[in-house]
Amino acid sequence: MAMLLLLIGLVAAVALFGWAFSSPSPSIKVGGAIAALAVLFLFVLFSSVRRVSENEIGIVVKHFGDELPSGTIIATNGEKGPQSKILGPGWHFWLWPGLYDIEIEPIVRVTSEQVGLITAVDGAPLPKGQAFAAEWDQPGKMLMAEYFLNEGNGHRGPQASVLKPGNYRLNTRLFQIDLADATNIPKAMVGVIKSNVGESPAATDGEIASIVAKGERGIWEEPLHPNKLYLNTNAYEITL
């Protein structure tokens, strides 16, 4: 749409120039040239405008700038490629077609019966022996792509952290979200967790511990009581 608007403005400006300079009147030539330049300016300006609605986010893809470092997918310092910063609701200016592509995506919705499983496609490599990135103490910060990739030192790959019910504006080029069912532990039952994340407990007498403390890797000694849980069931296997 933006490129079409730019082309219409260019055609209109050329047509005005042609009409003005075909006139024998000097004043018409000058006036037509000014009008053509004004039309071209307005169409160029309007073609840079993008609107993002309340239930959408805008992914910015930049077509000029430095190359991304090897192995990097998301730009955090103005390199060309998908940008870490997303566009929120409202009008956004100076995003000319040809220089930028804007991909409009719906916000991520997680219902009360669901949990959002997160996989990051960029970031630091997972520590050796880890299949999931550790849970974040501040999950809100984790979802800020710039923070995740810079000072947060987020890890690429499956995340132990999840999206709980709600609406989320996040960079879907960085975070892939798969919706799964929340876990319900009925009354009169408990849930036993086998954790695939966390530190492995120290072996005792040469044997690997089978029952571990909460937060360690293995079968937790502390069960979960009846409740609705929003957990990554790939990272935390629950048996009722």
Give the positions of each predicted feature.
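N-terminal hydrophobic membrane-entry segments
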Residues: M1-L240
